[in-house]
Amino acid sequence: MTRVFITIDWFLPGTNSGGPVRSVANLIAAMPECQFYVFTRNTDYCATEAYEGITPNTWVRFSEHCEVYYCTEQNLSKATIAAQLKAIAPDVLYINGIYSKAFSRWPLAIGRQIGMRTVVAARGMLSPHALGVKPFKKYLFLTWMRWLSAYAHVIFHATSEVEKTDIQKVLGGQMNVQVVPNLARLKQLAPQAISKEEGLLKLV
């Protein structure tokens, strides 16, 4: 079974951040042949209170083929992510977004360092409209990333041909971009009750 390690700033049961959360949930629901490990925050977008009833800083069974690590702000570090990647030893690292230090840039650097197969979902962040918000800061960051060849080892996931064009326009036509549309919602996903049964809760 293919093991996929996903990094995303916010995930279910949080919904405040919108589309990316649902897109990732749909991806997980549509691929029961894979085992997913989602590394995320233990709070929702723009929220300060932790999710009720969910134990943070450990792997929690979310569905039959998905576990989630709800990380607290105090425990969030590059070393923590590297340790979890080493412990899980996934076949694929799937990064959501471009700019987040903890959930995009750190995983990208770690994946490159250890030679891990890495997929980056830009989530529309390289569209002309998105680049128009704080453009100078983004221009400097993306220029720096191109200079470092930071995405040379990456496969980009675009959800349309338009997004593929946006990615290659910003980062270079040589970028490996695969187009896979967002998947339709299959079923509601919600965290299952935490179980101490062997194999259902991993303490790393």
For each feature predicted by the language model, list its residue ranges.
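Active-site proximal beta-strand in glycosyltransferases
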Residues: 3-4, 92, 108-128, 155-157
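N-terminal subdomain of nucleotide-sugar transferases
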Residues: 1-52, 60
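Short N-terminal targeting/anchoring amphipathic segment
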Residues: 82-103, 114-119
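A conserved catalytic-core segment of Leloir-type glycosyltransferases
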Residues: 37-92
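Carbohydrate-associated surface elements
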Residues: 162, 183
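Nucleotide-sugar donor-binding and catalytic loop/hinge architecture
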Residues: 1-3, 187-203
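Membrane-proximal helix-turn-helix segments that form the acceptor-binding/catalytic region
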Residues: 138-156
